[in-house]
Amino acid sequence: MTTGFLQKIFGSRNQRLVKQYQKTVAAINALETQIETLTDDQLRGKTGEFRQRIAAGESLDKLLPEAFAVCREASRRVLKMRHFDVQMIGGMVLHYGKIAEMRTGEGKTLVATLAAYLNALAGRGVHVVTVNDYLAQRDAEWMGRLYNFLGLSVGINLSGMEHDQKQAAYAADITYGTNNEFGFDYLRDNMVYETDSRVQRPLNFAVVDEVDSILIDEARTPLIISGQAEDHTELYVRMNALPPLLERQIGEEKADGTGVEKPGDYTLDEKGRQVFLTESGHEKAERMLAEWGLIGDGESLYAPQNITLMHHVYAALRAHTLFHRDQHYVVQNDEVIIVDEFTGRLMPGRRWSDGLHQAVEAKEHVKIQSENQTLASITFQNYFRMYAKLSGMTGTADTEAYEFNEIYGLETVVIPTNRPPKRIDKQDQIYKTAKERYDAVIRDIRECHERGQPVLVGTTSIENSELLSHLLKQAGLPHEVLNAKQHAREAAIVAEAGRPKRITIATNMAGRGTDIVLGGNVEKQAAFIEADESIPADEKARRIQQLHDEWETLHEQVKTAGGLHIIGTERHESRRIDNQLRGRAGRQGDPGSSRFYLSLEDPLLRIFAGDRVRAIMDRLKMPEGEAIEAGIVTRSIESAQRKVEARNFDIRKQLLEYDDVSNDQRKVIYQQRNELLEAHDIAETIGAMRHGVISEVVRQFVPAGSIEEQWDLPELEETLRNDWQLDLAIQEMVNESSSINADEILDAVTTAADEHYEAKVALVGRESFSAFERSIMLQTLDRLWREHLAALDHLRQGIHLRGYAQKNPKQEYKREAFELFAAMLDAVKQEVTRIVMNVQIQSPEQLEEAAEQIEEQGGQLGNVEFQHADFAAAAAAATAGGAVVADATAEMVGHAMSHSGPAGEVPRVGRNDPCPCGSGKKYKHCHGKLN
């Protein structure tokens, strides 16, 4: 109450910021007359002048009014578009490292040019990040004319580009590209073996378009570069026969034995999207697997030798019960392609992790691709936080403002519209059944069609969009369907969605990034005419003028009919996605309207609010086909959405806390790699490692401060001779000197190791040997880092079970991950020292051969894939401790079974200690063994 009273007097934080920025806009407008008098060359020359002033110490903030005025004037001349005052405010918000929320149609693409131009003047690079290649290419070509006019270079970073093209794109002043490609390039840069092979510069400033989609919807899933691992194709095919033999149990058994309506083999929790085998399900699964010869008669699925089978059972079960064709994925060209749950777009190349994708492939009887081993991974949360300055734009950020601030430290500023919005958002209508809902939708569409009003219908899945398309065909209503299957025609369909009587069905936010202009997008049609070389120039001009005249008539016709009408056929889990759909109408002060039609059979209502709404309908004795249209129901639905959003935020926050652990380790490894790549000579590093390793070897047999009776000299001599190529008569040395102590023995062995090393260097020369050492160090570091990532995955998937032992899973994960990391660094030292001490060379040519041989033996993985992984696996770890219910609890259970046990405490690994990888072998026979 006090807050509201103070806001009335002083205004909200948002209002105060906008008012502050408006003063700067006034200063920019005051410069406009002066800037307009400049010739094109003088205007272009301002860029060089600004750069000199920056070099002399002037700040970007001080340059802002003049730079924005120059950018606006250049845009007016080149693009025939003058930035509105509100767009100037948007540009300032981006420059100051905040998020600008701007309504659809307010010109976000043009706003980005202001902040990009100003920050590019510093010469450290600006990345403009979009959600797909089409938008990156469109914006780079469209806005590139403006930047080129002002003397700045523009690069486009697309997937599949050649290495030198990427280097050129990143060297440009402003680089357009997709979030995935920027992230993958960062990972690839940290896998190279030569400094010249890197493409990125240090991450300076990023403007993220559709920031909510990239930093929130996509943040939960990591980017993964992977290579093929062991092949279990046959096992997936065998396991695929199991789920159809199992029956679902209806109801959960309570403590008193009641609650089960229909006994079965597995339970399904739709709210948490979990699946669990019941006791009878376990017995039936074990019986079937024994019949198929996959386990022995009477054996348990939990027996150590059957651990991996449990993982495959759950993968198959999840594939059959939780993942549905044309909703979660489509099958095209003998391939399972994931459908993005937020945008409805197809995501070719992206695969679910941990065997789920293979299980779905087996279910659909398409070719099963091999499982992969992770080579490198990073989440968008951690990638984008590495930029020195980060900003973003979207039409819907305010509902997630808390998360942006909490995770990324980004403040959200709502930018006023250039013209007052005229869209009318009508009350939701709720029906008892989906059939009644669709009947009402068809009625509404028919009414709009008859009065010439264009309609955009939003659905939540491909399946629903095709069902609605079928109903419209039956009703004789012509329409266009825009879902993942029509991806190639997306821009063309959206461009025409504002024409009179046009009916367009869109899956979620497919087509985002292209404006729906009332009367149709005349610029798109004009571009097609311009591109047609067979039409003479004067004929082109005549046709384009005719198009503009026709558009004026159509535009007025649609405005009179009420503008674009938005129909939502289902509420999404997130209010933000609903707002994005609504936001397609009423652009730039145009009229428009929106309404959501819901049914009690919708997942959101059924899971969160169905019983309450059904009770209201029963109490009111609602006849069939009659809808509830009440504020209390809409508020109830929004409350359910807030619960889901809060749950998803908790998942993302917990995921980040887990990922921060591996992120800190990733930074250490990548920093060490970069130092190795840039160092001219790493002899000092190799020497320090050698001394540490030799000291550890000697101390195993001759402990510090011990007496002669405690020494095991024969074993020490044998170990040095077999493992380190050092032939020393230590027993003889001790016999000859009665006063020798443990430290002197260590000194003698260290000196011998140094001499052995120097003799190798002398044979081939310091420069050649240094290159060999660098190569071996990088290969060993990369291989052990890969194995470490796999170990962290296993640790994370089973860590939630520590909660049952009254331990904090998060703290346990941090502790054990650190111990694994320390063991990995020790293993790197051991292995590099072992290779350098054992390599037999006589010439530089032999040295190159040895390096190649070690690389082959190191198991370089082929068929490298770049994936933006599925949320399911990531959420599994985030929900550790049971604080939050996630999409993939079944996956957690499956992997808890497949994990061979918690990582042991290994502060330092001795030769005879168990190997920290969990194989059960001694370290010297496992990761301590020379390949």
UniProtKB/Swiss-Prot annotation:
PROSITE patterns in the cross-refs: SECA, SECA_MOTOR_DEAD
Record-listed ATP binding positions: Q87, G105, E106, G107, K108, T109, D515
Gene Ontology BP annotations: intracellular protein transmembrane transport; protein import; protein targeting; protein transport by the Sec complex
SMART domains the record matches: SecA_DEAD, SecA_PP_bind
Cofactor: Zn(2+)
Keyword match Cell membrane: yes
Recorded topology in the membrane: Peripheral membrane protein
Gene3D superfamilies to which the protein is assigned, alphabetical: Helical scaffold and wing domains of SecA, P-loop containing nucleotide triphosphate hydrolases, SecA, preprotein cross-linking domain
Note on how the cofactor is bound: May bind 1 zinc ion per subunit.
Alphabetical keyword list: ATP-binding, Cell inner membrane, Cell membrane, Cytoplasm, Membrane, Metal-binding, Nucleotide-binding, Protein transport, Translocase, Translocation, Transport, Zinc
GO terms assigned for molecular function: ATP binding; metal ion binding; protein-exporting ATPase activity
Places the protein is found: Cell inner membrane; Cytoplasm
Any Gene Ontology CC annotation: cytosol
Disulphide connectivity of cysteines: none
Enzyme Commission numbers on file: 7.4.2.8
Sites where the protein binds Zn(2+): C915, C917, C926, H927
HAMAP family found in the cross-reference section: SecA (MF_01382)
Family as reported in the entry's similarity comment: Belongs to the SecA family.
Described function: Part of the Sec protein translocase complex. Interacts with the SecYEG preprotein conducting channel. Has a central role in coupling the hydrolysis of ATP to the transfer of proteins into and across the cell membrane, serving both as a receptor for the preprotein-SecB complex and as an ATP-driven molecular motor driving the stepwise translocation of polypeptide chains across the membrane.
Protein name: Protein translocase subunit SecA
Organism: Burkholderia mallei (strain ATCC 23344)
